[in-house]
Amino acid sequence: MLPSHRKMTSHPHNLSAVIFGVEGPRLSFLEHPFLQNRCYGHTRDDVSALGRAAYDGLLASGVMPVIKHMPGHGMAVADSHKGVSRVTESYEYLIENDFAVFADFSDAKMGMSAHILFDAIDPLWPATLSPRMIDIMRRELAFDGLLMTDDLSMEALPGTIPTRAMAAQRAGIDIVLHCNGDAGEMQSVAEVLEQPTPKTHQRMQAAIGARDALVPQSLDIDALHAQLGV
């Protein structure tokens, strides 16, 4: 698929103000079978080019992209929804390939972390919970956008849901996401989190400001009903 075609297919056609707030272009390499419908290619050049086209197409439609899963999920050998997933490649390989794609998107206002263990960098903690990995995202990849976790209830993370939330925040994550709908778990997460830091507030405001700048100032409700068929 050409980048221009990717941009067209990423265009939600003026429904952003009602349906779409954010969307997550996946910038990982296509290696593992469970990723095959979710990635843009096998090489840095392909993923960066098609990812940028998708990113620009979303912006043009008033939808704020959330780049994911930082700093790269493609070389993982297992599905992180189901259990621990590791990447065994060297730091030198990763910084020139998987991580490099995210460096190409350092201008993004929002990103999502990967629940992946990178053995060459931090073999003990998945990137979401690893201060070392988050420091790489901030310093080496120059990403200063709002950084959120993937779903805390995924099986790749150790410990209880509340301890996962605390560890992510202490590692440097700005926002933790709990997505399975269990209200009791959500309450337990809310009870253990600290207040956002001033830097997190700054990143939030930058993301909100960028998002608000994309939203149409007026909305034709009749035209929207016709487009949705309701």
For the regions a language model picked out, list residue spans one by one.
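Structural motif
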Residues: 14-15, 171
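Low-complexity, compositionally biased segments
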Residues: 14, 101, 177, 183, ...
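A generic, well-ordered mixed alpha/beta core segment in the N-terminal half of proteins
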Residues: 1-13
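Extended, intrinsically disordered, low-complexity segments
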Residues: 194-230
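Active-site-proximal loop/short-helix segments
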Residues: 18-38, 42, 67-84
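Second-shell residues forming the walls of enzyme active-site clefts
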Residues: 46-59, 63-192, 196-202, 206
